[in-house]
Amino acid sequence: MSSVSGVRTPRERRSALRSLLRKRRQRELASKVASTVNGATSANNHGEPPSPADARPRLTLHDLHDIFREHPELELKYLNMMKMAITGKESICLPFNFHSHRQHTCLDISPYGNEQVSRIACTSCEDNRILPTASDAMVAFINQTSNIMKNRNFYYGFCKSSELLKLSTNQPPIFQIYYLLHAANHDIVPFMHAENGRLHMHVIFENSDVHIPCDCITQMLTAAREDYSVTLNIVRDHVVISVLCHAVSASSVKIDVTILQRKIDEMDIPNDVSESFERYKELIQELCQSSGNNLYEEATSSYAIRSPLTASPLHVVSTNGCGPSSSSQSTPPHLHPPSQATQPHHYSHHQSQSQQHHHRPQSPPPPLFLNSIRAP
């Protein structure tokens, strides 16, 4: 008991001393941990600067990036121990290679700027939203013959080309990346083309404001591995993600192309899909050329460009835009010459020779991506 004069008893003094020492040890321990990760955070600990005895080597920002790159789990622990969420954003340069993407950051693309935003500071992501993984996308790839209508937006990008569809069955990452992107952004238009026996994909976003969650990016890179380059760019005022194949790895998954092709042939193509390909015609041409396929002008000099979805020349399409006219039934689509106004000189030379021999000379078929571009 304390005396009347207010003097503490020995027991009270020992209790107060133990409490003081315990609080001091807690402050010292917190100061040591904070100064080890980032010396600047120690000044925020009760507003007291660290004492000289507690001084530790401070890590620079570059040191932290190197550590987090080698040990991603430490980055998560570092973010979890922070009491206040960081609000910093980092601008990115276009074209942006996804392999240079910082972990745990989302991508915000808009007319106001292109930035990487930390996941914990992102205001667009929903906490209760669960996105599919690369494994989920592989399961969907295996079961795609049973879910044609669910993934119909993906098959529109083949424009009913059996050659492109056959290539896709040997390249699961193309489907996986589309599947992951479509789960995060529904307003996308995929387009496929081939070069040197490899299938490539361009995904056009129809909105000017695009948000790609960090979980989606991580799973895309998991599916792409080192065989595909995934880049984001703005082409003709549209956000585009290009998936280019560098090497085709052997896949143990086998898809029945015959069943897949038959179901796709039976699928109706909506008019708005035809209109979207017509609207993005010049954009698609530029994307194909930028990815290394520069055969467009050479091929159009000798072949009529066919409509992507009806497989018929554009100049015999009916005026209502819903189908070919009656004249298209009398002549096979691949024998229609281009219009007189757009015929090049050497095409006229070939045409005169074909009239003399009563048949058109044999020439190699046009590139596969020409089946998906309409003539002006």
Curated annotation (Swiss-Prot):
Residues 22-57, 316-376 are annotated as: Disordered. GO terms for biological process: viral budding from nuclear membrane. The modification Phosphoserine is found at S19. Phosphorylated at serine residues in the N-terminus. This phosphorylation regulates the localization within the inner nuclear membrane. Phosphorylation by viral kinase UL97 at Ser-19 plays an important role for correct viral nuclear egress complex (NEC) localization. Plays an essential role in virion nuclear egress, the first step of virion release from infected cell. Within the host nucleus, NEC1 interacts with the newly formed capsid through the vertexes and directs it to the inner nuclear membrane by associating with NEC2. Induces the budding of the capsid at the inner nuclear membrane as well as its envelopment into the perinuclear space. It comes from the Viruses. A zinc finger (CCCH-type) spans 106-211. It is found in: Host nucleus inner membrane. It comes from Human cytomegalovirus (strain Merlin) (HHV-5). Residues 33-45, 317-332 have a biased composition (Polar residues). One of its GO terms (cellular component) is membrane. Forms a heterohexameric complex with NEC2. Interacts with capsid vertex specific component 2/CVC2; this interaction directs the capsid to the host inner nuclear membrane to initiate budding. This is Nuclear egress protein 1. Belongs to the herpesviridae NEC1 protein family. Pfam families: Herpes_UL31. One of its GO terms (molecular function) is zinc ion binding. The keyword Lipid biosynthesis does not apply. Keywords: Host membrane, Host nucleus, Membrane, Metal-binding, Phosphoprotein, Zinc, Zinc-finger.
